[in-house]
């Protein structure tokens, strides 16, 4: 049921975008400079004629479905009194670095610092290797109780974590419970120090 609802929401969003594209495609011209240069992010829904209210509602609905509804993929837990959270792979009922990093990306974009911090804490506590040749990297696959199912790392997860942490540093600064910039730098250092044999 959970998988069905998630797929239904995603398909609905694609249908909505897909049905609007043919009639409005002429209005959408490529930008000469990207957001990194201009500081402006392109809003395709706005360009397609949707009102700010409609766009905000669609985003809020999607966030609610994934993070707060009865069929959510995000779960909050406490481990030794520390608030943590994880994003469950809906099909396999497990946790992967990909899902964790995607959850953090959504949280930083939606300005949900507590959710972001919970996911990062869970990832560091359960997924990050504390010793051995993969020290500092993350097991890509865990059970929802935190037990690692695969010790190897998947570099996409680490790179997405770095991106999320850099965005969090920019949005929230580094003076709170988590120094996002330092975490990103530490992870980058761990990534660059590996020779590929671990």
Locations of regions flagged by a protein language model:
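Bacterial N-terminal signal peptides that target proteins for export
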Residues: 1-10
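Solenoid-repeat scaffolds in large eukaryotic assemblies
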Residues: 103, 115-116, 177, 184
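Hydrophobic core
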Residues: 15-19
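Active-site cradle of extracellular carbohydrate-active enzymes
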Residues: 107, 120, 195-198
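Extended ligand-binding groove/face enriched in aromatic
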Residues: 69, 125-198
